[in-house]
Amino acid sequence: MEEKTISFITSVKICKGYHDFGHRIRLYIENISFHCKKCNIDFEVLIGEDVDDKNEIFLSEILSDDFLKKHNAQIIQTQQSSYKNPLKYNMLEAPNKNACMYKSKGKFICFTSGDVLMNSEFFDYIHKFQENSFYRFLTYEVKALDCDFENAKLDYVLDYCSRNILRCYNDTY
């Protein structure tokens, strides 16, 4: 197994009300790929996708095999219904991310939501990571994007986000 410096792991289920999430995931992957390649970071992106009859569309219908290969990304399909869940909680995140973590090759693992975009400061810091450490990074909430996610370009979205910050969370490393 070829070890990577870092595995980026997220979770998704594209069902009613989340039709644009596949395109948000596309931007998420492009953002990671762009910055990791720029900073010479060996990486992989793993997306756990819960699949059942509630899916309106599958991620593989939005992201081509060529796109995934170009950006070192992989879709790992899971079925939430296969996990014991006596209290019937929505367990989308845990089973999906656990399945990805099991398959990950990264020395470090970064768990995020699929609509998170990280800035260059985050990627610059990856080279400083130390084993057996937990890192939490500053996050910003921004206004809703002013264009259609399906046609959004990464550079435009990053610029838009930097100009439309609503609030900031957790300024700690």
Question: Predicted regions span which residues?
Answer:
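Active-site beta-to-alpha loop of glycosyltransferases that engages the nucleotide-sugar donor
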Residues: 10-27, 51-53
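Short, acidic, metal-binding catalytic loop of nucleotide-sugar glycosyltransferases
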Residues: 25-41
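Short beta-strand/loop segment that forms part of the nucleotide-sugar
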Residues: 41-52, 76-80
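Short aromatic/hydrophobic "clamp" motif used to bind/position activated sugar donors
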Residues: 109
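Cell-envelope/extracellular polymer assembly enzymes that use nucleotide-activated donors
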Residues: 5-10, 44
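The conserved acidic donor/metal-binding loop of glycosyltransferases
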Residues: 113-117
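Conserved catalytic core of nucleotide-sugar-dependent glycosyltransferases
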Residues: 101-102, 119-173
